[in-house]
Amino acid sequence: KSADGKITLNVINYHVGTDYAADYYEYLFDAFKKTEEGKNVEFKFEEIPTTDAYNQKIKLLISSGDLPDIVLNGGNNITALAAKSGKVTDITEYLDKDPEWKAMFSDQDLEFNSYEGKVYGIPVSKEISYIYYNKDLFKKAGLEAPDVAYETWDDFYKACDTLKSKNITPVSMDTADLGWLSNLWYSGLIGTAGEEGNKFMNTMYPTDYTSDLVVNATEQLQKMLKNYTTADALGGKYDTMATHFFNGEVAMLPNGPWMIPDFKSTDKAPEGFYDKVGIMLLPGSGMESVPTPGDMVGAKDPEKIKAAVAFLKFETTAENQLKALEMAGLQPVSSNNEVPESLKESDPLMAEVLDIQSKAKYTYGQNQAYWYQNVIDTFSTQLPELAYGNMTAKEFCQKLTDAAKKN
């Protein structure tokens, strides 16, 4: 504390400039100072304008140096690394003392942010994805989209065949840069394949991809790459594929809520595109849902630790979770949020995203969150070979397994 009783918290902030959440974090730091717990708190900021530079800096400070009092998450899962260094606070007792706060998070969220049974990170959002579809293209093909999802993958393929018969490319897929879109289709194919498939897609670092179930999903992914996507998907990157969707050249694309602001942006999509977009879950009512790395406390002084924990608590109030959704497209970490009337008017698509989550029968992870890096790389580099028919689904799965076993 300084002489005037103020507590100064050091923060390295990458939510600055044109960052998607810059306005939200500016609001959050200001609003906290107006609360009972934050009225004596001042923030001292060091600004780093990119996530990559920020993540490198934090990793450096974990190995040698002092961490900021509040360690914002940069999307990288560094919980174990930080916990092992002894430089971050164990938040478990604070959560246990406040059951209402603890109830905001699922066991999965807290487990993801724990090391050796102790919680070190407080997640502020979760990553989810589903399917966006173009209402105009569905109408043109004489198709009525399901309210929630196609009941089966076969129903989904029938719709793809109908779209194709009207010269409409059914889905966006990619293979370069880790093949994000193809990974979301693949994760859905496995994650909705009954209890066994769902368990597999919720497992961290699997090492065996040779089960009939995964081979079958791979055969279906191969079919989609061969029959239902754009010619440039092989070797193609996400940005190009997203542009196809914006331009009305593709009927469906899997992705998360962070894409919604792009539908309104005339830099990316044509005027009025937002109104043409609908949402559905993956066939079988599947939805990717992955816990995110949380914010941590790097403060040493007991007064500062107390103030930093109070900030994390403020950051995750129901009100601020919805504010983060409205201002930054961050998906609330709690799944029982009321959909505010104001959101239904200002951003009906985002309101629909909040609403449809409770209708998922299967939730599962995706490979970039749960698989070894070299397996993700192998997935991306071997996809074109699979698509061209240069290898069978079985051989593809063996390559993933060989890569995983090297870890």
Regions picked out by a protein language model, each given a short descriptive name:
Residues 108, 275-280, 325-378, 384-385:
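Long, aromatic- and glycine/proline-rich binding clefts that accommodate carbohydrate-like moieties
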Residues 1-80, 84-85, 96-100, 145, ...:
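Conserved N-terminal structural module of periplasmic/extracytoplasmic solute-binding proteins
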Residues 7, 34, 39-42, 141-144, ...:
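Extracytoplasmic/periplasmic substrate-recognition and gating elements
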